[in-house]
């Protein structure tokens, strides 16, 4: 049997999204189904969210006033009206299937129905830039832990524990892997291609990151340099700190890429450096929207003392010029008074002598 798929299923009821790495130049479609039992409060709550690449495009919530599959991307307005009726019915049917799954899991794990439990699945497909299929996946989780997953070959299953082996035997006998493989390799790909065409202005764009480095003193001897990348799409990006040209991967604190709230993404990477050695560190930013990688360093702010010196020098220069003008005017004034005549300005000069008087001490 193949290895279990990564533990990426999260409780989407809280709106969390774990971004799944994809190959550069590829596209993906993913669906997340979550059913949460709530004893004494009626039917389990059932939620579906669908993503094309990093953009949510559909959502269903059984707790809505009128539960329907809903549009979450503007370009989904291009689909025919019956699409929403069909997807709503599929969602309602799946909600009932998941209700049964929750009850079955209670028996398999010998648990009481008094507590709340969660059953989830994530499935989807990925295609190359030219639309060719290259990867599919389907995995299930119970109470936040792996339950069973379709292997990489899309022909067999891996169960996480003895309880899940009951499901594995049942699905192997029913040929469930073959059914899912057919969907992932064909129907999933066809829909993904269609969505990519409808939303190409959004989904196939490449917004470059706005990047900069900030400086945060940690102590008298150390400081933290943080490299920021903001406003980029798609989500795939690389931030690498280097010291004298050598990667500092082991010493870098790197946060997960996260949504920026406006359809773009943000990320940062930080490294602690000795004070005074900041200029030896550079941040390298690579993203599909950049014509070439960015190389950034921390730019120290202008020193206040240097600014003050510059201002003082400028003021002194102005005073020297004014002093020279005053001296010239005084000499001309004294020269005119000595001859006992009146000073008459040359033709074309200033006719208002008041400006000269204002310069006198």
UniProtKB/Swiss-Prot annotation:
Region span, Connecting peptide: 299-308
Membrane-spanning residues: 309-329
Signal peptide limits: 1-24
Region (Alpha-2): 115-206
Cellular localization per UniProt: Membrane
Chain intervals for the UniProt region annotation (Alpha-1): 25-114
GO terms assigned for molecular function: peptide antigen binding; signaling receptor binding
Any Pfam family hit: MHC_I_C
Stretches of the chain found on the membrane's Cytoplasmic side: 330-361
InterPro entries recorded: Ig-like_dom, Ig-like_dom_sf, Ig-like_fold, Ig/MHC_CS, Ig_C1-set, MHC_class-I_related, MHC_I-like_Ag-recog, MHC_I-like_Ag-recog_sf
Glycosylation sites: 110
PTM-bearing positions, type Phosphoserine: 355, 358
Region named Alpha-3: 207-298
PANTHER family: HLA CLASS I HISTOCOMPATIBILITY ANTIGEN, C ALPHA CHAIN, MHC CLASS I-RELATED
Stated family: Belongs to the MHC class I family.
Function of the molecule: Involved in the presentation of foreign antigens to the immune system.
Protein name (record): RLA class I histocompatibility antigen, alpha chain 11/11
């Amino acid at each position: 049997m193949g290895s279990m798929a990564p533990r990426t299923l999260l409780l989407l009821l809280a709106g969390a999204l774990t971004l799944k790495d994809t190959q550069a130049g590829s596209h993906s479609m993913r669906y997340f189904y979550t059913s949460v039992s709530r004893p004494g409060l009626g039917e389990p709550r059932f939620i579906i969210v669908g993503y094309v690449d990093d953009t949510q495009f559909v959502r269903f919530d059984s707790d809505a006033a009128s539960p329907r599959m809903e549009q979450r991307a503007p370009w989904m307005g291009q689909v025919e009206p019956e699409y929403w009726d069909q997807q709503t019915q599929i969602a309602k049917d799946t909600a009932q299937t998941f209700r049964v799954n929750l009850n079955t899991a209670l028996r398999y794990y010998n648990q009481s129905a008094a507590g709340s439990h969660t059953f989830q699945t994530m499935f989807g497909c990925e295609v190359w830039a030219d639309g060719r299929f290259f990867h599919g996946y389907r995995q299930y989780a119970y109470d936040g832990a792996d339950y069973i997953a379709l292997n990489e070959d899309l022909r067999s299953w891996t169960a996480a524990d003895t309880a899940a082996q009951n499901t594995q035997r049942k699905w192997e006998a029913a040929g469930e892997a073959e059914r899912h493989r057919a969907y992932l390799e064909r129907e999933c790909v066809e829909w993904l291609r269609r969505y990519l065409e409808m939303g190409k202005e959004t989904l196939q764009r490449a917004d470059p990151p706005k990047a900069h480095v900030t400086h945060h003193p940690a102590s008298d001897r150390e400081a933290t340099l943080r490299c920021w990348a903001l406003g980029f799409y798609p989500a795939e990006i690389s931030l690498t700190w280097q010291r004298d040209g050598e990667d500092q991967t082991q010493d870098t604190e790197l946060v997960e890429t996260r949504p920026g709230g406006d359809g773009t993404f943000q990320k940062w990477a930080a490294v602690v450096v000795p004070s005074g050695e900041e200029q030896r560190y550079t941040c390298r930013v690579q993203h599909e929207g950049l014509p070439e990688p960015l190389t950034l360093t921390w730019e120290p702010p202008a020193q206040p003392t240097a600014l003050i010196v510059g201002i003082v020098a400028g003021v002194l220069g102005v005073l020297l010029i004014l002093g020279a003008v005053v001296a010239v005017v005084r000499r001309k004034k004294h020269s005119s008074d000595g001859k006992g005549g009146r000073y008459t300005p040359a033709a074309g000069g200033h006719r208002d002598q008041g400006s000269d008087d204002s310069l006198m001490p």
